[in-house]
Amino acid sequence: MRTFISIISLLFSTLCFSQATTTVETVIVDSGKYEFKLQAKKDTADYSKAFRILTNQVKLNPKNAEYRYFLGYTIDRLNADDGKGMFQLKKEMTVKASEQFEEVNRLEPVYKGELFILDPYAKLTSIWGSLAEAYLNRRLADSAKWAFSEGKKRGGFIEPILEFNRQLLKSCDKNAILVTYGDNITIPIWYLQTIENYRTDITVVDANLINTIWYSKYLKSERNLKISFSDAVIDTIEYKEWQSQQITVINSIDTTQKFSWELRPTYLDNYILKGDRILLDIFQQNFYSRPIYFNNNSDSSYNLFLTPYLVDEGLVNRVTTKIFDYSTDVVTVSKNLYNYNIDKVQKEDITKSRDAAIVLNGFRWAYFNNVYHLVTQANYDKAKELIKLMGDKFKTDKLPFTSIEVEKYFADIFQQVDKNYR
C-alpha cells in the first residue's frame, strides 16, 4: 500500500513539476512579446529589454515563427518608433528586421501566430517602403529604388496589394491629390510611382504622416504641393483647441466661387490635431485647382468632416461642393466599378496574407456601398446588376470574405434585393 502511495505521489510530483516547468517556459516565452506590447503603449518607449528577451528566445527556439515576428517588430521600433523618426531610418537595422520577417514567411507561409498590427508580408512592405521614402526625403533616388526593389525581392510588395493600388490610382482624375490612410495603401503607391512610374501626376498625402514635421516639408519641396505655411511655421504648429465652425474656401481666380462646410473638432471633442491643420491648409490652397480624393470608407474625423460632400467613385471618394443626399438624389454608379478586376492576382497570394485579403475586400465594399444606396432608393434592378457584376469579378473561391459576419451582412442585403427584384 505504501509502495502504491509512493508511486502515486511520485507521479503526482512529476506531473506538477512538468506543469510548473511548462508554465515557467510559457511565461518566459510570452515575456518578450508582453514587454514589446507594454512598451508600444507608452509615449516614450524603450524596446531594449524586449529585444534582449526575444533575441534569447529565438536563439533557444529558432523555428518559432512568433518569436521571430515580434523580434522583427522590436528591431523595427528600435530603428524608428513612429513616423516622426522615419526619415532617419538606418539600412542595417532595416535589413535585420527584414531577416526576421523573411524567416517567419519561410517557417510559416501562412503565419499562425499572434499579429501585432501588420502580417509579415505587409510588414516587409512597410519597413522597406519606409526606408525608400527616407532616401527620397534625402533626394537619393537610386537608393530609394534599390530599397523598393530589395523589399519586393525579400517578400514584400506582393502582387495583390500592388494591383489594388494600381486600380485605386486609376480611379483618380489627372493631377489629383489623394489623401490616404495606412501602410497598406500609402507605401505600395510610393512603390508604383517610383519603380513603375505609374500615375506620378497624383500627389499622395498620408493623413498619419502629415502629423510629422519632415513629411509636410517633403510634400512642399519634393512633391510640389501648395502649402501656405513656411518651413519655420511648420516647425511650430501644434494641436490646438477648436470649436465647430464654418470653413470657407474661395477660388482665387473667380472669387464668386465659394465652398463652405462645418469643421468640427477632430480630437477629444475640443481639439484639432497638427496634421488636420496642415491638411485643412492643403485643401484650402488646392481645392479649386486640383481634384481632391479620399480613399474609400474614410472616417469623418480623418476627412475634415467633408463626408456629406463626398461622391462615391468606387475605391475613392471625390470632394465636391454639393451635399449628396442618398435619400433623394439619384445614385449614379461610377464607371470605375465596371473596370475593376483581380485577373492578375493568384489565389495563393491572397490567402497567405491576411492584409492582402482585407485590402482586396475593399473592392467588395466599393460595390456593396453602391448596392446599399440603390436599395435605399428601391432601385432593385440596378442593385441586382451590380451584385452580379461583383460576383463575377470577385468570386469567393479566389477572394474569400474576411469574416463570416461580413459575409452574412452582405448576404442579408442581397436577399433583400432578390426578394424585391422583378
Residue ranges and their predicted role:
Residues 1-26:
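Bacterial Sec-dependent N-terminal signal peptides
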Residues 187-188:
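Phosphate- and divalent-cation-binding pockets in alpha/beta enzyme and binding domains
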